[in-house]
From Swiss-Prot:
Keywords: Ribonucleoprotein, Ribosomal protein, RNA-binding, rRNA-binding. GO terms for biological process: translation. One of its GO terms (cellular component) is cytosolic large ribosomal subunit. The keyword Transferase does not apply. SMART domains: Ribosomal_L14. Part of the 50S ribosomal subunit. Forms a cluster with proteins L3 and L19. In the 70S ribosome, L14 and L19 interact and together make contacts with the 16S rRNA in bridges B5 and B8. This is Large ribosomal subunit protein uL14. It comes from Aromatoleum aromaticum (strain DSM 19018 / LMG 30748 / EbN1) (Azoarcus sp. (strain EbN1)). NCBIfam families: rplN_bact. Pfam families: Ribosomal_L14. GO terms for molecular function: large ribosomal subunit rRNA binding; structural constituent of ribosome. PROSITE patterns: RIBOSOMAL_L14.
Length: 122
C-alpha cells in the first residue's frame, strides 16, 4: 500500500534511485495505491549522469509492494520493499531496462512493455 509521502525504489535504468509519492491517481479521495496503480512521484535521489534529475515530477506505476497482492487462488505475493517504474506522459516506461521481478497483475495492455522487459514475472 502506497500513500502520499511513501518512498519507493526505482526498478528501471532512468538514473533515479529513490522517489516519493506525491499523489495517488484515480479519484479525488483515493488514499492507497497497490501493484499496477499509477501514482505521481518526485525524484528524491538520482545518479549523476542519469536521464532524470532530482526534483523532477513523473508518473510511475507501482510494480512491487511489501503489502503484496492477493491472487484469486488465495496465494499472496509479497516483496521486501516498494518499487516503481517511471512513465512518460503517454504512460510508456522511460527506461529501457527493468530490474527485479514484477507480478503477473501488470499484464494489462497498458503495461505489457514493462512485463516484457522484466527479468522475472511472478
Amino acid at each position: 500500500m502506497i500513500q502520499m509521502q511513501s518512498r519507493l525504489d526505482v526498478a528501471d535504468n532512468t538514473g533515479a534511485r529513490s522517489v516519493m509519492c506525491i499523489k495517488v491517481l484515480g479519484g479525488s479521495k483515493r488514499r492507497y495505491a497497490g501493484i499496477g496503480d499509477i501514482i505521481k512521484v518526485t525524484v528524491k535521489d538520482a545518479a549523476p549522469r542519469g536521464r532524470v534529475k532530482k526534483g523532477d515530477i513523473y508518473s510511475a506505476v507501482v510494480v512491487r509492494t511489501a503489502k503484496g497482492v492477493r491472487r484469486p487462488d488465495g496465494s499472496l505475493v509479497k516483496f521486501d520493499g516498494n518499487a516503481a517504474v517511471l512513465l512518460n506522459n503517454k504512460l510508456e516506461p522511460i527506461g529501457t531496462r527493468i530490474f527485479g521481478p514484477v507480478t503477473r497483475e501488470l499484464r494489462t495492455e497498458r503495461f505489457m512493455k514493462i512485463v516484457s522487459l522484466a527479468p522475472e514475472v511472478l
